[in-house]
């Protein structure tokens, strides 16, 4: 249902598991090539490598937005202003999204963007790696879901909408969130030092 749109769709693709999954499912379901976008620095852009691999695998029309240190510095003040927070982690994570969305708005006809946001909160990530047991994992996951509006959703909503784009977050579907949160948290714990489940 997130793929129905009156305007052209685009997909943010970091090369990580979450955005790659969203893009792969969309590529299978849509009758045309999807358009994917990634962003990286002009030096040491390891994420671009993985995004390119995912894009090649699913056969998307892929665009890489390359940014410099100067681009990041110039974006800092407007990003802090639009977020309305000085939370360092949120600001750091927002700069790339802000710049890629600005590039999409300025250079394409894309007006709707799908992202892989919220899956970390549902299935665990760095902040749940050290949970001593399943109950602590679930407690932290529930806390992260309750606070989404202060961090990831804040970042995605504002960085995307300030660039006149509409955000769609498949992992945020309420039925899916209910299902994911009902999974035994012991199954989501990082027991093998392999990252996400």
What does each model-identified segment do?
Residues 1-197:
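ATP-dependent adenylate-handling active sites, centered on carboxylate activation for C-N bond formation
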């Amino acid at each position: 249902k997130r793929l129905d749109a009156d305007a052209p769709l685009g997909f943010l693709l970091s090369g990580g598991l979450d955005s790659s999954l969203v893009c792969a499912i969309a590529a299978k379901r849509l009758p045309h090539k999807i358009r994917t976008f990634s962003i990286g620095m002009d030096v040491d852009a390891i994420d671009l490598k993985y995004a390119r691999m995912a894009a090649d695998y699913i056969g998307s029309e892929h665009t890489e937005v390359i940014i410099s240190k100067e681009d990041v510095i110039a974006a800092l003040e407007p990003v802090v202003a639009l977020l309305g927070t000085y939370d360092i982690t949120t600001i750091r994570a927002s700069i790339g999204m802000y710049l890629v969305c600005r590039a999409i708005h300025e250079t394409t006809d894309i007006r709707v963007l799908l992202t892989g946001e919220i899956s970390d909160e549902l299935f665990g990530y760095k902040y749940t790696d050290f949970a001593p047991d399943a109950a602590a994992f679930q407690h932290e996951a529930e806390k992260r879901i309750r606070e989404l509006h202060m961090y990831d959703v804040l970042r995605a909503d504002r960085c995307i909408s300030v660039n006149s784009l509409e955000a769609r977050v498949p992992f945020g579907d309420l039925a899916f969130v209910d299902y994911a949160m009902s999974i035994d948290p012991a199954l989501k714990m990082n027991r093998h030092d392999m990252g996400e489940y």
